[in-house]
Amino acid sequence: MKVDLNADAGESYGAFAYGHDREIFPLVTSANLACGFHGGSPGRILEAVRLAKAHGVAVGAHPGFPDLVGFGRREMALSPEEVYADVLYQIGALSAFLKAEGLPLHHVKPHGALYLKACRDRETARAIALAVKAFDPGLPLVVLPGTVYEEEARKAGLRVVLEAFPERAYLRNGQLAPRSMPGSWITDPEEAARRALRMVLEGKVEALDGGEVAVRAETLCIHGDNPNAPEVARAVREALEQAGVEVRAF
């Protein structure tokens, strides 16, 4: 059995530091790098690409809404054509840095509000999938299972990678609990590790609003903006490896 461990990175902007890139890169197997719209100034993106290269971490594009002030966590009413163009633009921007450093683009995973909107809005999901397909039909797209986002990615003929979140709470409907909801963040590293094991080995996890929810996980996400993200990533990886799960990029 194997699973990927991913984290968001490269989200600092100029003098404004964000996340724990240097601490978390040695612990994960893939990283989703900001592309300049929600975070990531050119110098910071290049820095993150070089860190990934040094640690053998697979690099994916992490396109978001054009919202630096809100860090891409505020939903925007963009047309499908605007979403398509924005995603294509951001993939291209990151690809320039990867080409300069001799690295391939490994996957695409939307950020924040764009990811969540794609999970429930079919037109947004389709626009993302078509942008990825237009850039490279062989690029994997990371999705939340059981959503219209997964459906549209499959319709586009893309390789779909199913994602789960050990440090985010789920609702019974399979969606992530809103960040504003008490208990939506799992901050204890050992609890996150326990949840990760259940997700990978049992295919389920407890829901915040009661009962359990089925989970399919080919990659597990650790949010880089979690205050103790390195500790969570370390605990999750150690627990998986001790259970005999191979942790490597998909």
UniProtKB/Swiss-Prot annotation:
Pfam families found in the cross-reference section: LamB_YcsF
UniProt-recorded Gene Ontology molecular function terms: 5-oxoprolinase (ATP-hydrolyzing) activity; ATP binding
GO biological process terms on file: carbohydrate metabolic process
Enzyme Commission (EC) number: 3.5.2.9
Keywords carried by this UniProt record: ATP-binding, Hydrolase, Nucleotide-binding, Plasmid
Reactions catalysed: 5-oxo-L-proline + ATP + 2 H2O = L-glutamate + ADP + phosphate + H(+)
InterPro entries: Glyco_hydro/deAcase_b/a-brl, LamB/YcsF/PxpA-like
Summary of the function given for this chain in its UniProt record: Catalyzes the cleavage of 5-oxoproline to form L-glutamate coupled to the hydrolysis of ATP to ADP and inorganic phosphate.
Subunit annotation: Forms a complex composed of PxpA, PxpB and PxpC.
Family label: Belongs to the LamB/PxpA family.
NCBIfam families linked to this entry: PRK05406.1-3, PRK05406.1-5
Protein name from the UniProt record: 5-oxoprolinase subunit A
